[in-house]
């Protein structure tokens, strides 16, 4: 306010005008603040309701909200300055008008004084003439100038109508103020009172952007001209009249140097005209790509992900928000759910829809899926589709009830494949988290009730139309009648406690709350013991959970603990009915407690008066009457609960048996494939080994043969050398001492010599 009060002091702004402008600014600031607060609260509540929120994602979203907050603050400041600067020049002229009027009043007062002094001067003049002794002449009194005032104008002695100073001021200042307000005054020096500093900065930025476009336009034109210079030279060589061809090229070169000149001067009926005009066409459309780029930059960016299978299954785009994904999931799940047993195809579709929502309905899993595709969800533990649909159905009423605590805990329990010991060790941390979450949950429900009941409080006759539409959409889901009956009963008696004769309803609420606490403690113990017996270990979890990475090891036949999938049909049905019944009862007690606290917050608001609180109580009672049409009473509640429990258990058992059969078939097919692959590998390896051994043996044999040949040659050479020496010695002996030799010996010696020669 101090900042904007400077306008009042600087431009001498009238008090009424300043108060009017400041009122508009206050209203604008309040509206912006309320809108911003509502959006931020809604955003943070959506984050808080998520099971997991990555720290980096939270930081990024927080920074984006801070940027949006600052942008809205700047916009409001800009709008307020616009309001304050809207007619500053008119106030200047009004002040000028006042000063001119003040001067005109002074001038008129001075003129009246002068006119009053004129008769005195004339009398003194006549007296002087009389005293001078001259002839006494009768001097008739001179009449005053015949000036008549005609409203704002004067008429002189000649009959001309002259504008007064006041009329001139009015024409120059008052009319200017009126024309400025109407927006028709065209004085270039003093008009445009709405042109502020922000407008000047905007125009400078716009001019800068236009200069950048002009620069890019010139560069594109020069590139086009360079591309077409070859064509121009080609045309110059082949035209009949070279002089006429050269003229357009010169004009075109001049046009490239000075692109501000229009292209009309280049157009001449020459042969090269077609080639010269092509750059001008590109020049005319230079601005179009810039506008397309600008439009694409302003549009929402499309996420590029490696795998879109789950998005295709749900029939949503990759940019779909959680509300759209949830709505699409329930629509598809409700179509497939009743027909699971009709064939494997329907169950397969129902299973895939649940898998898709288990991934895309969770922020962390969705982020990993968007980043890595199928590889990012290999370790995700998927629940039995019917169990997941049961928990999702209990969460479907979250606008009226919030997400039940048992649903949050069981999802955490199943998805993390925790044992009961792990759950007990983390119980303290979980309880603290659930207590804080419960407060936020009750505040959300109370806010939602206020939003849907506000039209009824305001007296709108059609306030119930959106509520009926909402309840019609919830109709048909699992355990819808028990949930609506609990909400109806709580809303009815809470509303009565704030109206006349409230003691009876207050007593009923107290008795029901105490009974719920006692039953809730027993049911919690029974559920924990049952889960610990049949789902206490990760091996026992295999009957209702699975993942893609260890899908072949999900069935553990060697486990000696009790497994639901190993029980008989009767025992399996009995155990599952107990578990489902316990889960539903705990959810209903939790829903009643949450609805009770939220309704009390709504009807005990200290920021409103008693009359408004009474209207809220009456509206809440009307809401309970509408819910009664869909609930059908306590007797119908028990029947519907029993029927839905048996129905859900039947589909859970069907899902367990179907998934286990698929896994067993896969496990049985593995050894056959392994044996077949082993035999094929053995044959292939044998062939490769034979070839490899043959090659190695051949090489080794060749090397060995070469070595043997070399050794034999050396030995033969040595033997031959030795034999020659022996022969020489024998010859010497023969010469010295003649020896007698038989013919047989001679024949043997010759034969041996020939044999040795042949071997060598």
From Swiss-Prot:
Name of encoding gene: RESA
Domain J: 307-375
Known role: May disrupt the normal intermolecular interactions of the cytoplasmic domain of band 3 and thereby facilitate the invagination of the red cell membrane which is necessary for the formation of the parasitophorous vacuole.
Source organism (scientific name): Plasmodium falciparum (isolate NF7 / Ghana)
Region (Disordered): 214-300, 683-738
Compartment(s) of residence: Cell membrane
UniProt name for this protein: Ring-infected erythrocyte surface antigen
Biased composition (Basic and acidic residues): 231-242, 262-288, 683-692
Residues listed as glycosylation sites in the UniProt record: 425, 559, 563
InterPro entries: DnaJ_domain, DnaJ_domain_CS, DnaJ_X, EMIR, J_dom_sf, PRESA_N, PRESA_N_sf
Major location (coarse): membrane
Classification via CDD domains: DnaJ (cd06257)
Topology within the bilayer: Peripheral membrane protein
Pfam families in the record: DnaJ (PF00226), DnaJ-X (PF14308), PRESAN (PF09687)
Keyword field: Cell membrane, Glycoprotein, Malaria, Membrane
GO cellular component: plasma membrane
Acidic residues bias: start-end ranges: 216-230, 243-256, 693-720
Taxonomic placement: Eukaryota, Sar, Alveolata, Apicomplexa, Aconoidasida
């Amino acid at each position: 306010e101090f900042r904007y009060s400077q306008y009042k002091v600087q431009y001498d702004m009238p008090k009424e005008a300043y108060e009017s402008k400041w009122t508009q600014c206050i209203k604008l600031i309040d509206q912006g603040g309320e809108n911003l607060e509502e959006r931020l609260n809604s955003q943070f509540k959506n984050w808080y309701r998520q099971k997991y929120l990555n720290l980096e994602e939270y930081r990024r979203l927080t920074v984006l909200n801070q940027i949006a907050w600052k942008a809205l603050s700047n916009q409001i400041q800009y709008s307020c300055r616009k309001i304050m600067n809207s007619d500053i020049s008119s106030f200047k002229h009004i002040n000028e008008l006042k000063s001119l009027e003040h001067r005109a009043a002074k001038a008129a007062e001075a003129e009246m004084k002068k006119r009053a002094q004129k008769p005195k001067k004339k009398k003194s003049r006549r007296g002087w003439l009389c005293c001078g002794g001259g002839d006494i002449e009768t001097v008739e009194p001179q009449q005053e100038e015949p000036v008549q005032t005609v409203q704002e104008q004067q008429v002189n002695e000649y009959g001309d109508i002259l504008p007064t100073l006041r009329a001139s001021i009015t024409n120059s200042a008052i009319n200017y103020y009126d024309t400025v307000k109407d927006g028709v005054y065209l004085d270039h020096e003093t008009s445009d009172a709405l042109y502020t500093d922000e407008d000047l900065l905007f125009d400078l930025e716009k001019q800068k952007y236009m200069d950048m476009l002009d620069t890019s336009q010139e560069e594109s034109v020069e590139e086009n001209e360079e591309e077409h210079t070859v064509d121009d030279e080609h045309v110059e060589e082949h035209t009949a009249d070279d002089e006429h061809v050269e003229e357009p090229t010169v004009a075109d070169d001049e046009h490239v140097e000075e692109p501000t000149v229009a292209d009309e001067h280049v157009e001449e009926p020459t042969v090269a005209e077609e080639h010269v005009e092509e750059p001008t066409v590109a020049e005319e459309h230079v601005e179009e790509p810039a506008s397309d780029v600008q439009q694409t930059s302003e549009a929402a960016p499309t996420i590029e992900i490696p795998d879109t299978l789950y998005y295709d299954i749900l029939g949503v785009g990759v940019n779909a928000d959680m509300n759209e994904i949830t709505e699409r999931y329930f629509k598809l799940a409700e179509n497939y759910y009743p027909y699971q047993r009709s064939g494997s195809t329907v169950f397969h579709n129902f299973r895939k829809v649940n898998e898709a929502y288990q991934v895309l309905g969770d922020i962390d899993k969705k982020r990993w899926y968007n980043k890595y595709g199928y590889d990012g969800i290999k370790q995700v533990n998927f629940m039995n589709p019917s169990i997941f649909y049961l928990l999702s159905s209990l969460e479907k009423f979250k606008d009226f009830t919030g997400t039940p605590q048992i649903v949050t805990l069981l999802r955490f329990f199943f998805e993390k494949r925790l044992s009961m010991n792990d759950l007990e060790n983390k119980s303290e941390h979980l309880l603290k988290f659930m207590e804080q979450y419960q407060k936020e949950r009750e505040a959300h429900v109370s806010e939602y009730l206020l939003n849907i009941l506000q039209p009824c409080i305001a007296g709108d006759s059609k306030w119930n139309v959106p509520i009926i539409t909402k309840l019609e959409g919830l109709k048909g889901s699992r355990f819808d009648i028990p949930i609506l009956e609990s909400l109806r009963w709580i809303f009815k008696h809470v509303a009565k406690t704030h109206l006349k004769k409230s003691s009876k309803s207050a007593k009923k609420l107290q008795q029901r709350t105490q009974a719920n606490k006692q039953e809730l403690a027993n049911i919690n113990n029974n559920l924990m013991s049952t889960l610990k017996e049949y789902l206490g270990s990760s091996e026992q979890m295999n009957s209702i959970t699975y993942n893609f990475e260890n899908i072949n090891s999900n069935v553990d036949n060697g486990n000696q603990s009790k497994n639901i999938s190993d029980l008989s049909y009767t025992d399996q049905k009995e155990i599952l009915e107990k578990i489902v019944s316990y889960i539903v009862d705990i959810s209903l007690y939790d829903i009643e407690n949450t609805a009770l606290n939220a309704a009390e917050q709504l009807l005990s608001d200290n920021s409103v008066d008693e009359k408004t609180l009474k209207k809220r109580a009456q509206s809440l009672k009307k809401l309970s009457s509408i819910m009664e049409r869909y609930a059908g009473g306590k007797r119908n509640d028990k029947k519907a609960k029993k029927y839905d429990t048996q129905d859900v258990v039947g589909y859970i058992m069907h899902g367990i048996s179907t998934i286990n059969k698929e896994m067993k078939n896969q496990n049985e097919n593995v050894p056959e494939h392994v044996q077949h692959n082993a035999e094929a590998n053995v044959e292939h390896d044998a062939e490769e080994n034979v070839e490899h051994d043959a090659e190695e043996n051949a090489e080794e044999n060749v090397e060995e043969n070469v070595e043997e040949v070399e050794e034999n040659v050396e030995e033969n050479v040595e033997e031959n050398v030795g034999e020659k020496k022996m022969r020489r010695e024998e010859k010497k002996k023969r010469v010295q001492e003649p020896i007698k030799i038989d013919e047989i010996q001679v024949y043997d010696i010759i034969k041996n010599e020939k044999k040795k020669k042949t071997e060598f």
